[in-house]
């Protein structure tokens, strides 16, 4: 991967663009600190249901970078106000990418470890996701990649498993 920097206002760098080795895929990244939220009543993460959305557009799919610098599908833990894994997945997708969708049961792709719900959707245009909105999103990076280039990134284990399952189909 190689980098190019974007400059805005007062020559202040706010985002970097990362390109794959072939130059066909680009991802936007930004440095930001994870907001600290401490809830003394929160249970251990493995006790919570989690949900995520695999978003594809043609041969590319959407990845977000989390605060630990790993790339993966938009995903997260269910909150008390999430009525179902589906609403959790919709909320996480909006928070991390700005993309608003209404998922159906037909979008359910896999359930992993009995508590991780993965939905899969296709969208007609990559322009439905505004990559320049990254500073307002709950992620530190976002972009579209193809299957071959994705494996050059620091992928989450979950995303690796999803890509392996998709490549076997």
Swiss-Prot record:
SUPFAM superfamilies: Nudix
GO MF annotation terms: hydrolase activity; metal ion binding
Protein name: Putative hydrolase 111R
InterPro entries: NUDIX_hydrolase-like_dom_sf, NUDIX_hydrolase_dom
Domain of life according to the entry: Viruses
One Pfam assignment: NUDIX
Domain Nudix hydrolase: 46-169
Keyword Magnesium among record annotations: yes
Entry cofactors: Mg(2+); Mn(2+)
Keywords, ordered alphabetically: Hydrolase, Magnesium, Manganese, Metal-binding
Keyword S-adenosyl-L-methionine found: no
Gene3D superfamilies: Nucleoside Triphosphate Pyrophosphohydrolase
Family: Belongs to the Nudix hydrolase family.
Residue positions binding Mg(2+): 92, 96, 138
